[in-house]
Amino acid sequence: GSALTPERSQQILDSGLTRIRFSFDAFTPGTYSKVRVGSLPLDRVIRNVETFLELKEKGNYKLPVVGVSFCKVKQNEHEVEDFIKFWQPKVDLISIQKFMPPTTNKEKYKKYYASDQYNELPVTEFKCVQPFQRFVFRNEFMYPCCVSFNKDLKLGSIKNTNIYDAWHSPKMNEIREMHKNGKFYEMKTCKDCVNLIYPPSEKLKNSTQKEA
């Protein structure tokens, strides 16, 4: 939302875009300045998004579907409810997301985990929707999701692989089938991802280590 201007907002509305989401990750200016370091002041970003919504309403645009997102971490978790109450009457959807570290080093990013992100029970079944929804391109390579810690999810290079063929490839179908059956643990990246998003509590981690 910080890059929005009335002119850009109008261009987006006229472009035929079907979905757009604005990330805030905070409700108060103080918290916003801590989690969104270097951004414009929060009130200005909110005003930008509200202008976008006003233009959409005045122009009777049905699309795009407008959402706002909030990545919950220890530093902002106390503002989730206020964030939802503020935006609920204004937008089509609100996404409250769990923190995902940029690497598999959980200990390094432990200080960011929200208090309710830890699991008292091990995650035994998880079905990811991303392989059914999207492709992600990173450094010319195609992936079935936004997580690419390891090479096991790499589906080929855009330079020599047709997108249609990659989308319908045996590997892509295998990943989808795996998640349909809740067997995320059969693929290293998927297993690492679930363990990072749903980390075990210290109590669970200790009991698991004792059993081992």
Q: What kind of feature is each model-predicted range?
A:
Residues 1-97:
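Radical SAM/AdoMet-radical enzyme domain recognition
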Residues 47-50, 54-65, 89-126, 142-201:
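C-terminal accessory region of radical SAM enzymes
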Residues 128-131:
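Short, small/polar residue-rich loop motifs at catalytic or cofactor-binding pockets
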Residues 137-139:
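Short, acidic, Ser/Thr-enriched surface-loop or helix-capping motifs
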Residues 166, 209-212:
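Short microdomains enriched in Cys/His and/or Lys/Arg
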Residues 201-209:
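Short cysteine/histidine-rich zinc-coordinating motifs and their immediately flanking basic loops
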